[in-house]
């Protein structure tokens, strides 16, 4: 016990010295990950022996120590192969060689000098996303484990780099538009420039900016797009505005799966003519649900004292995160949202609910069209009395 505590203290002391040193040498970063690996190996062994504390250090669960040790081994081996390359003399800091940088897109590559790329889906500021492009990307060859330094690029289709003449995308704007957009159009803003795109301008060869073009530190691959000049620009000789809307190409997609919405104990299938995207839920504008044993409707919501709602059922933490995420859509896509609630009494479980209140059925349909329901959460459309 005392020997293990002394060895763990020495390991942690070495880590503190490396943090204070803040070196930019690759060999120090390799040493850092070797110590992280050793620390988690000792914590793993301590937990196996039934210890919960070693000195002042709390011993985590076996799975936690094992996962961190495996991550440290992976990063250490990658840095050791990088040490044998021509880029070992470059400056490598703790930030450059951290696990988050290793796992950031493109994964299993080293990256330097990030650049923010703003994408406005549907041309709306309410649906913009910020992605990180990289000036320099260090790619390891799968055949001989050698490292190659390639420039990061961005065009109207996504963020990518080229290695051995092959384009490798690590962010596909077309795929992202299925999640964050509706119309399949977007604008790409990078370094004060807007990359223009129309579906007719997509080709297999993209014109890339040369090294001497002062566009931005990250290379832009922009297809020339003919734009009709206005009458004013024709007279003055000025170019038309460059803030154009990007239109997504129509990539081949598999047939969309028909998604079910659970209402009470009934399963309603969307109409076969409607395509429901992944993560979206179809809203049914039905004022009554017919009883299978009677021709009379079960509920009549034609009264003016009822409002459309959706009860979201699922894990409590997931519902809390979802409620926080949709706060920015308040007043536009919904009127109010409840706190997390549970049923009390009877045959109740730990299932949580969140109720979303809408001013109209159309607003509820717009909410379900634009907001992705989290996986594992079931949307239950219905009506409630307008008691407040």
From Swiss-Prot:
Entry PTM: Phosphorylated.
Quaternary structure annotation from Swiss-Prot or TrEMBL: Binds DNA as homodimer. Interacts with protein E1; this interaction greatly increases E1 DNA-binding activity. Interacts with protein L1; this interaction enhances E2-dependent replication and transcription activation. Interacts with protein L2; this interaction inhibits E2 transcriptional activity but not DNA replication function E2. Interacts with protein E7; this interaction inhibits E7 oncogenic activity. Interacts with host TAF1; this interaction modulates E2-dependent transcriptional regulation. Interacts with host BRD4; this interaction mediates E2 transcriptional activation function.
Membership in a protein family: Belongs to the papillomaviridae E2 protein family.
Chief location of this protein within or outside the cell: host cell
Region (DNA-binding domain): 306-388
The organism's place on the tree of life at top rank: Viruses
Keywords annotated in UniProt: Activator, DNA replication, DNA-binding, Early protein, Host nucleus, Phosphoprotein, Repressor, Transcription, Transcription regulation
Entry's Gene Ontology molecular function annotations: DNA binding; DNA-binding transcription factor activity; nucleotide binding
Xref: InterPro entries: E2/EBNA1_C_sf (IPR035975), Nucleotide-bd_a/b_plait_sf (IPR012677), Papillomavirus_E2_C (IPR000427), PPV_E2_N (IPR001866), Reg_prot_E2 (IPR033668), Regulatory_protein_E2_N (IPR036050), Regulatory_protein_E2_N_1 (IPR042503), Regulatory_protein_E2_N_2 (IPR042504)
Region (Disordered): 227-259
Protein name per Swiss-Prot or TrEMBL: Regulatory protein E2
Cellular-component GO terms for this entry: host cell nucleus
Function: Plays a role in the initiation of viral DNA replication. A dimer of E2 interacts with a dimer of E1 in order to improve specificity of E1 DNA binding activity. Once the complex recognizes and binds DNA at specific sites, the E2 dimer is removed from DNA. E2 also regulates viral transcription through binding to the E2RE response element (5'-ACCNNNNNNGGT-3') present in multiple copies in the regulatory regions of the viral genome. Activates or represses transcription depending on E2RE's position with regards to proximal promoter elements including the TATA-box.
The UniProt record lists the keyword DNA-binding: yes
Polar residues compositional bias, start-end: 235-245
Database matches in HAMAP family: PPV_E2 (MF_04001)
Matches recorded under SUPFAM superfamilies: E2 regulatory, transactivation domain, Viral DNA-binding domain
Subcellular location: Host nucleus
Ranges where the record places region Transactivation domain: 1-202
